[in-house]
Design a protein with these regions (language model features):
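Extreme N-terminal starter segment of soluble prokaryotic enzymes
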Residues: 2-8
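Conserved N-proximal alpha/beta basic substrate-recognition cap immediately N-terminal to
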Residues: 11-116, 120
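C-terminal active-site "lid" helix and adjoining low-complexity regulatory extension at the edge
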Residues: 30-34, 223, 237-241, 250-291
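A short glycine-rich, hydrophobically flanked beta-strand micro-motif that places a catalytic Asp/Glu
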Residues: 47, 174, 185, 241-253
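ATP-grasp fold ATP-binding core
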Residues: 102-103, 127-148, 168-181, 185
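Rossmann-like NAD(P)H-binding beta-loop-alpha module
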Residues: 110-136
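Protein kinase-like catalytic core scaffold
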Residues: 135, 175, 195, 244, ...
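Phosphate-binding site of ATP-dependent enzymes
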Residues: 151-239
Protein backbone atom coordinates (compact mmCIF):
# COMPACT_ATOMS: atom_id res chain seq x y z
CA UNK A 1 0.00 0.00 0.00
CA UNK A 2 1.19 3.50 -0.81
CA UNK A 3 1.64 6.26 1.73
CA UNK A 4 -0.81 8.40 -0.22
CA UNK A 5 -2.97 8.32 -3.33
CA UNK A 6 -3.73 10.99 -5.91
CA UNK A 7 -7.49 11.22 -6.18
CA UNK A 8 -9.87 13.30 -8.28
CA UNK A 9 -12.93 14.70 -6.54
CA UNK A 10 -15.75 15.79 -8.86
CA UNK A 11 -18.51 17.95 -7.40
CA UNK A 12 -22.18 17.99 -8.43
CA UNK A 13 -23.54 20.59 -10.86
CA UNK A 14 -25.94 22.96 -9.04
CA UNK A 15 -28.94 22.00 -11.21
CA UNK A 16 -28.81 18.53 -9.65
CA UNK A 17 -28.87 19.91 -6.10
CA UNK A 18 -32.40 21.37 -5.87
CA UNK A 19 -32.66 23.24 -2.56
CA UNK A 20 -29.48 21.41 -1.47
CA UNK A 21 -26.52 23.20 -3.06
CA UNK A 22 -24.91 24.09 0.28
CA UNK A 23 -25.65 20.67 1.80
CA UNK A 24 -24.23 18.77 -1.16
CA UNK A 25 -21.19 21.03 -1.10
CA UNK A 26 -20.71 20.36 2.61
CA UNK A 27 -20.56 16.57 2.29
CA UNK A 28 -18.20 16.85 -0.69
CA UNK A 29 -15.91 19.12 1.35
CA UNK A 30 -16.09 16.83 4.38
CA UNK A 31 -14.92 13.85 2.32
CA UNK A 32 -12.13 15.90 0.77
CA UNK A 33 -10.94 17.09 4.19
CA UNK A 34 -10.97 13.58 5.68
CA UNK A 35 -8.95 12.26 2.73
CA UNK A 36 -6.44 15.09 2.97
CA UNK A 37 -6.15 14.60 6.73
CA UNK A 38 -4.97 11.06 5.96
CA UNK A 39 -2.27 12.45 3.67
CA UNK A 40 -3.93 11.83 0.32
CA UNK A 41 -3.77 14.39 -2.50
CA UNK A 42 -7.17 15.42 -3.86
CA UNK A 43 -7.62 17.53 -6.98
CA UNK A 44 -11.09 19.07 -7.27
CA UNK A 45 -13.01 19.24 -10.54
CA UNK A 46 -16.44 20.43 -11.60
CA UNK A 47 -18.97 18.07 -13.18
CA UNK A 48 -18.52 19.66 -16.62
CA UNK A 49 -14.76 19.03 -16.47
CA UNK A 50 -15.50 15.38 -17.22
CA UNK A 51 -16.54 16.37 -20.73
CA UNK A 52 -13.19 17.99 -21.56
CA UNK A 53 -10.86 15.03 -20.94
CA UNK A 54 -8.76 16.89 -18.38
CA UNK A 55 -9.14 14.37 -15.54
CA UNK A 56 -6.18 12.01 -15.54
CA UNK A 57 -6.30 10.52 -12.02
CA UNK A 58 -6.85 6.76 -11.74
CA UNK A 59 -9.09 7.17 -8.68
CA UNK A 60 -12.22 9.30 -8.62
CA UNK A 61 -14.88 10.11 -6.06
CA UNK A 62 -17.77 12.01 -7.51
CA UNK A 63 -21.30 13.35 -7.07
CA UNK A 64 -22.12 13.80 -10.77
CA UNK A 65 -25.61 13.35 -12.25
CA UNK A 66 -25.83 14.63 -15.86
CA UNK A 67 -26.26 12.09 -18.66
CA UNK A 68 -23.09 13.30 -20.37
CA UNK A 69 -20.94 13.19 -17.24
CA UNK A 70 -22.25 9.78 -16.18
CA UNK A 71 -21.56 8.42 -19.67
CA UNK A 72 -17.99 9.72 -19.43
CA UNK A 73 -17.57 8.08 -16.01
CA UNK A 74 -18.68 4.78 -17.52
CA UNK A 75 -16.17 5.19 -20.34
CA UNK A 76 -13.37 5.88 -17.84
CA UNK A 77 -14.38 2.91 -15.70
CA UNK A 78 -14.09 0.62 -18.73
CA UNK A 79 -10.54 1.96 -19.12
CA UNK A 80 -9.66 0.94 -15.55
CA UNK A 81 -10.45 4.07 -13.55
CA UNK A 82 -11.76 3.29 -10.06
CA UNK A 83 -14.86 5.30 -9.12
CA UNK A 84 -16.96 5.99 -6.04
CA UNK A 85 -19.78 5.95 -7.04
CA UNK A 86 -19.56 3.97 -10.27
CA UNK A 87 -21.06 5.66 -13.31
CA UNK A 88 -23.03 2.48 -13.90
CA UNK A 89 -24.41 2.67 -10.37
CA UNK A 90 -25.44 6.29 -10.82
CA UNK A 91 -27.33 5.32 -13.97
CA UNK A 92 -29.04 2.50 -12.08
CA UNK A 93 -30.40 5.04 -9.59
CA UNK A 94 -32.49 6.71 -12.28
CA UNK A 95 -36.00 5.81 -11.34
CA UNK A 96 -36.98 3.52 -14.20
CA UNK A 97 -33.86 1.35 -13.91
CA UNK A 98 -34.12 1.34 -10.12
CA UNK A 99 -37.78 0.29 -10.15
CA UNK A 100 -37.05 -2.60 -12.52
CA UNK A 101 -33.97 -3.76 -10.60
CA UNK A 102 -35.78 -3.63 -7.26
CA UNK A 103 -38.56 -5.76 -8.75
CA UNK A 104 -36.08 -8.21 -10.27
CA UNK A 105 -34.09 -8.67 -7.05
CA UNK A 106 -37.06 -8.51 -4.65
CA UNK A 107 -36.12 -5.28 -2.89
CA UNK A 108 -39.33 -4.23 -1.06
CA UNK A 109 -40.92 -1.22 -2.74
CA UNK A 110 -44.44 0.09 -3.47
CA UNK A 111 -46.43 -1.45 -6.30
CA UNK A 112 -45.16 0.49 -9.30
CA UNK A 113 -45.48 0.65 -13.06
CA UNK A 114 -43.47 2.46 -15.73
CA UNK A 115 -45.69 4.46 -18.11
CA UNK A 116 -44.59 5.66 -21.53
CA UNK A 117 -46.72 8.77 -21.99
CA UNK A 118 -45.63 9.15 -25.60
CA UNK A 119 -47.70 6.11 -26.56
CA UNK A 120 -50.27 6.05 -23.73
CA UNK A 121 -53.33 8.25 -23.52
CA UNK A 122 -52.92 10.61 -20.58
CA UNK A 123 -56.42 9.54 -19.54
CA UNK A 124 -55.47 5.88 -19.07
CA UNK A 125 -55.19 4.74 -15.45
CA UNK A 126 -52.35 2.26 -14.63
CA UNK A 127 -53.78 -1.13 -13.69
CA UNK A 128 -52.05 -1.20 -10.29
CA UNK A 129 -54.43 1.51 -9.08
CA UNK A 130 -58.05 1.37 -8.03
CA UNK A 131 -60.28 4.39 -8.40
CA UNK A 132 -59.75 5.22 -4.72
CA UNK A 133 -55.98 4.82 -4.69
CA UNK A 134 -53.65 7.73 -4.01
CA UNK A 135 -50.38 7.52 -5.88
CA UNK A 136 -47.13 9.20 -6.80
CA UNK A 137 -45.99 10.11 -10.29
CA UNK A 138 -42.23 10.52 -10.69
CA UNK A 139 -40.07 11.23 -13.71
CA UNK A 140 -38.49 8.00 -14.86
CA UNK A 141 -35.69 9.23 -17.09
CA UNK A 142 -33.33 10.81 -14.62
CA UNK A 143 -32.79 12.44 -11.26
CA UNK A 144 -35.17 14.95 -9.71
CA UNK A 145 -34.25 18.56 -10.45
CA UNK A 146 -37.47 20.38 -9.47
CA UNK A 147 -40.47 19.92 -7.22
CA UNK A 148 -42.92 18.85 -9.95
CA UNK A 149 -40.68 15.95 -10.99
CA UNK A 150 -42.34 14.12 -8.07
CA UNK A 151 -46.10 14.62 -7.74
CA UNK A 152 -48.56 13.26 -5.17
CA UNK A 153 -51.95 12.46 -6.71
CA UNK A 154 -54.73 12.19 -4.15
CA UNK A 155 -57.32 10.88 -6.64
CA UNK A 156 -56.62 8.85 -9.77
CA UNK A 157 -59.14 11.00 -11.66
CA UNK A 158 -56.46 13.71 -11.59
CA UNK A 159 -53.79 11.55 -13.22
CA UNK A 160 -54.53 12.84 -16.70
CA UNK A 161 -53.65 16.45 -15.91
CA UNK A 162 -50.51 15.35 -14.05
CA UNK A 163 -49.42 13.25 -17.04
CA UNK A 164 -50.06 16.21 -19.34
CA UNK A 165 -47.78 18.41 -17.25
CA UNK A 166 -44.95 15.91 -17.64
CA UNK A 167 -45.52 15.67 -21.40
CA UNK A 168 -45.51 19.46 -21.72
CA UNK A 169 -42.07 19.42 -20.11
CA UNK A 170 -40.91 16.77 -22.64
CA UNK A 171 -40.85 14.05 -19.98
CA UNK A 172 -42.52 11.06 -21.63
CA UNK A 173 -41.66 8.30 -19.18
CA UNK A 174 -42.85 8.26 -15.57
CA UNK A 175 -43.08 5.77 -12.73
CA UNK A 176 -46.47 5.58 -11.03
CA UNK A 177 -46.34 4.11 -7.51
CA UNK A 178 -49.04 3.42 -4.97
CA UNK A 179 -49.06 5.73 -1.95
CA UNK A 180 -48.09 3.90 1.25
CA UNK A 181 -49.43 4.76 4.69
CA UNK A 182 -47.03 4.70 7.62
CA UNK A 183 -44.02 6.46 9.10
CA UNK A 184 -41.61 7.91 6.57
CA UNK A 185 -37.95 7.64 7.48
CA UNK A 186 -34.84 8.90 5.76
CA UNK A 187 -31.56 6.99 5.77
CA UNK A 188 -27.91 7.32 4.75
CA UNK A 189 -25.37 4.54 4.39
CA UNK A 190 -21.90 3.69 3.12
CA UNK A 191 -21.38 0.17 1.82
CA UNK A 192 -18.41 -1.71 3.25
CA UNK A 193 -18.48 0.28 6.51
CA UNK A 194 -20.61 0.09 9.67
CA UNK A 195 -21.97 3.58 8.99
CA UNK A 196 -25.76 3.83 8.84
CA UNK A 197 -27.94 6.75 9.94
CA UNK A 198 -31.71 7.15 9.95
CA UNK A 199 -34.19 9.75 11.20
CA UNK A 200 -37.74 11.06 10.79
CA UNK A 201 -37.52 13.89 8.20
CA UNK A 202 -40.80 15.45 9.30
CA UNK A 203 -39.22 16.09 12.72
CA UNK A 204 -36.33 18.07 11.19
CA UNK A 205 -35.74 20.63 8.48
CA UNK A 206 -33.77 18.23 6.28
CA UNK A 207 -36.12 18.03 3.29
CA UNK A 208 -35.79 19.16 -0.33
CA UNK A 209 -39.43 19.79 -1.10
CA UNK A 210 -41.41 19.06 2.08
CA UNK A 211 -43.26 16.12 0.50
CA UNK A 212 -42.75 14.06 3.65
CA UNK A 213 -45.54 16.06 5.29
CA UNK A 214 -48.11 14.14 3.23
CA UNK A 215 -47.64 11.12 5.52
CA UNK A 216 -48.06 13.32 8.60
CA UNK A 217 -46.17 13.19 11.87
CA UNK A 218 -44.52 9.84 12.59
CA UNK A 219 -46.26 7.55 15.05
CA UNK A 220 -43.01 5.95 16.14
CA UNK A 221 -43.96 2.55 14.73
CA UNK A 222 -41.56 -0.11 15.98
CA UNK A 223 -39.29 -1.58 13.31
CA UNK A 224 -35.95 -3.35 13.01
CA UNK A 225 -33.11 -0.97 12.21
CA UNK A 226 -30.93 -4.00 11.40
CA UNK A 227 -33.52 -5.10 8.85
CA UNK A 228 -33.66 -1.60 7.36
CA UNK A 229 -29.88 -1.51 7.03
CA UNK A 230 -29.83 -4.99 5.50
CA UNK A 231 -32.47 -3.98 2.93
CA UNK A 232 -30.55 -0.80 2.10
CA UNK A 233 -27.22 -2.58 1.75
CA UNK A 234 -28.83 -5.16 -0.53
CA UNK A 235 -30.34 -2.35 -2.60
CA UNK A 236 -26.93 -0.66 -2.84
CA UNK A 237 -25.39 -3.95 -3.97
CA UNK A 238 -28.09 -4.43 -6.63
CA UNK A 239 -27.69 -0.86 -7.90
CA UNK A 240 -23.86 -0.97 -7.65
CA UNK A 241 -23.44 2.11 -5.46
CA UNK A 242 -21.22 2.53 -2.41
CA UNK A 243 -22.53 5.85 -1.08
CA UNK A 244 -26.30 6.03 -0.80
CA UNK A 245 -29.36 7.42 0.92
CA UNK A 246 -33.09 7.49 0.50
CA UNK A 247 -36.50 7.14 2.05
CA UNK A 248 -38.58 4.25 3.34
CA UNK A 249 -42.06 3.72 4.73
CA UNK A 250 -42.65 1.70 7.89
CA UNK A 251 -46.17 0.24 7.91
CA UNK A 252 -48.18 -0.33 11.09
CA UNK A 253 -46.97 -3.95 11.23
CA UNK A 254 -43.31 -2.87 10.98
CA UNK A 255 -42.97 -3.83 7.31
CA UNK A 256 -40.35 -1.71 5.54
CA UNK A 257 -40.49 -0.66 1.90
CA UNK A 258 -38.10 1.61 0.02
CA UNK A 259 -39.76 4.55 -1.74
CA UNK A 260 -36.62 6.39 -2.88
CA UNK A 261 -32.95 5.48 -3.20
CA UNK A 262 -30.23 7.90 -4.28
CA UNK A 263 -26.58 7.82 -5.21
CA UNK A 264 -24.67 10.07 -2.83
CA UNK A 265 -27.23 12.41 -1.21
CA UNK A 266 -26.37 15.27 1.14
CA UNK A 267 -25.93 13.40 4.47
CA UNK A 268 -27.05 16.74 5.93
CA UNK A 269 -27.82 15.68 9.54
CA UNK A 270 -24.66 13.56 9.78
CA UNK A 271 -22.24 15.33 7.47
CA UNK A 272 -18.98 14.88 9.37
CA UNK A 273 -19.56 11.27 10.40
CA UNK A 274 -20.84 10.47 6.92
CA UNK A 275 -17.87 12.19 5.31
CA UNK A 276 -15.47 10.20 7.45
CA UNK A 277 -17.17 6.91 6.51
CA UNK A 278 -17.19 7.80 2.81
CA UNK A 279 -13.49 8.67 2.91
CA UNK A 280 -12.84 5.35 4.65
CA UNK A 281 -14.76 3.49 1.95
CA UNK A 282 -12.88 5.29 -0.83
CA UNK A 283 -9.52 4.27 0.61
CA UNK A 284 -10.69 0.69 1.17
CA UNK A 285 -11.80 0.44 -2.46
CA UNK A 286 -8.53 1.92 -3.73
CA UNK A 287 -6.41 -0.38 -1.55
CA UNK A 288 -8.36 -3.40 -2.75
CA UNK A 289 -7.61 -2.34 -6.32
CA UNK A 290 -3.91 -1.91 -5.51
CA UNK A 291 -3.47 -5.44 -4.13
Amino acid sequence: MKDFYRIAGISRAPIYSPNSIDKDGAIFLAVLQHLEAKGHQVKVYQEDDLLHDIIKEKYIFNMVRSYEAVSKLQELEKQGVVEVNSGFGIENCRREQMTRLFHQYHIPQPESVVCNLEYKSTGVKPNILSSETSCWVKRADGHTTQVNDVVFVSETSKLGEVFEDFVERSINRVVVSEHLQGDIIKFYGVAGTPFFYWFYPSMTHHSKFGLEEINGKPKGITFSVDQLQAICNKAAEVLVVDVYGGDAIVALDGTIRIIDFNDWPSFAPCCQDGGKAIAQAIIQIIEKEEI
